[in-house]
């Protein structure tokens, strides 16, 4: 959540950030501006009434001590107190309205984030490893998976519905091996391995920014204040919800393997075949809580940690700087890692590393103490990696002419 003080003192800065995102919020933003104007006016009136109450109370005390008639002052105090209580209630209600609007305003766009109108304006930063030259036409992963008997898409539909799959046989061993490899690499890079619940309450989803704006994107448990997590970013970040840590404990670096659940609202017709876009998938996540001065360096560290895994698996990939219009709700700056898929003849996102600055920390009240003063931390998150998409990339990049899959050396010891 952005700072309420910033909204009150520099409304134009917030409006400009929304414009950079191609998200002007239209009439809603105008109504918010009207509420803020009304709030400021009432706040001035309230301060005036409080000052008057203090002044008259002081006079009342003096006259009481002098044993002078105070009936007029008493009446003034009583009338002013009624006005004061009514106005205090009104100001409180306006503050709630402002905070409710604040909860659906996305993060401020970072100065480092380039301007753009759509994902077409994202900027390639660098490429790592050269895509292989095939002597045959490479197949897509769903063909290879079915040929090798690794993924059963029909059973996924039978057990649940479309966008679910069953992984079995040697494919399941590869899937498990990838998870172990990812966690080992992340641990080597200083991230603590943590296993968390796959269910969280509403407060936790508010803390990381999924609620209230993106309620359609998450699965809710009927008759319970519980939701299936869309990412371990939610659980890892919120381990420090409403917490103050000493500055000496920063940075806090965490990694977790969890199932993730997403409704994929608005994705009808996209990636309908295969494992690219599923309602349930596994992901190994990185989350860091840092001092504000260290978050930029941490973002680079997290990117390199994820890239290191792809290099070990001999998978060509690239770093892509997202433009302002393609940023996620909580992100101030995001760099994607896209892996090469020869079957599709294109790069596809496999990791997204975001610096949210103090946006999530303000929502979740994540603070640190330095020089006896509490300050908001910075939080970062990123995939390291999406397991299903990594398996997709492994199959497509390491396929042989006969449809068999070469296993990279780094993965052999896990099988």
PLM feature spans:
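TRNA-recognition modules of translation machinery and tRNA-sensing kinases, especially anticodon-binding
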Residues: 127-415
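N-terminal alpha-helical targeting/anchoring segments
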Residues: 1-132, 150, 154
């Amino acid at each position: 959540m952005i700072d309420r003080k910033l909204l009150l003192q520099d409304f134009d800065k917030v409006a400009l950030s929304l414009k950079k995102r191609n998200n002007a919020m239209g009439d809603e933003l105008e109504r918010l501006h009207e509420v803020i104007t009304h709030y400021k006016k009432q706040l001035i009136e309230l301060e005036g009434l409080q000052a008057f109450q203090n002044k008259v109370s002081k006079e009342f005390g003096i006259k009481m001590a002098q044993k002078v008639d105070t009936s007029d002052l008493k009446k003034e105090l009583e009338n002013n107190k009624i006005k004061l209580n009514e106005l205090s209630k009104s100001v409180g209600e306006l503050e709630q309205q402002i905070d409710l609007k604040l909860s659906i305003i996305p993060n401020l766009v970072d100065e480092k984030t380039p301007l753009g109108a759509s994902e077409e304006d994202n900027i390639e930063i660098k490429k790592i490893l050269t895509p292989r030259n095939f002597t045959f036409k490479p197949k897509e992963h769903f063909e290879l998976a079915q040929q090798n008997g690794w993924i059963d898409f029909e059973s996924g539909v039978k057990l649940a519905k479309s966008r679910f799959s069953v992984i079995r046989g040697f494919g399941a061993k590869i899937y498990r091996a990838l998870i172990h490899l990812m966690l080992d690499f992340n641990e080597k890079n200083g991230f603590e391995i943590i296993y968390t619940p796959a269910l969280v309450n509403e407060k936790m989803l508010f803390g990381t920014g999924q609620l209230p704006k993106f309620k359609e994107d998450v699965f809710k448990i009927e008759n319970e204040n519980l939701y299936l997590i869309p990412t371990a970013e939610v659980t890892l970040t919120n381990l420090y919800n409403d917490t103050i840590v000493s500055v000496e404990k920063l940075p806090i670096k965490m990694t977790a393997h969890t199932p993730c659940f997403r409704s994929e609202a608005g994705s009808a017709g996209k990636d309908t075949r295969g494992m690219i876009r599923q309602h349930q998938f596994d992901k190994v996540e990185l989350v860091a809580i840092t001092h504000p001065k260290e978050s930029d360096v941490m973002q680079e560290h997290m990117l390199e940690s994820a890239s290191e895994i792809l290099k070990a698996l001999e998978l060509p990939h690239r770093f892509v700087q997202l433009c302002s219009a393609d940023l996620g709700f909580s992100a101030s700056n995001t760099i994607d890692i896209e892996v090469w898929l020869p079957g599709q003849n294109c790069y596809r996102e496999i990791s997204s590393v975001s610096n949210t600055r103090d946006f999530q920390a303000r929502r979740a009240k994540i603070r640190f103490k330095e020089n006896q003063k509490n300050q908001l931390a910075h939080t970062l998150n990123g995939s390291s990696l999406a397991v299903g998409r990594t398996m997709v990339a492994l199959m497509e990049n390491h396929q042989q002419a006969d449809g068999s899959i070469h296993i990279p050396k780094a993965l052999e010891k896990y099988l």
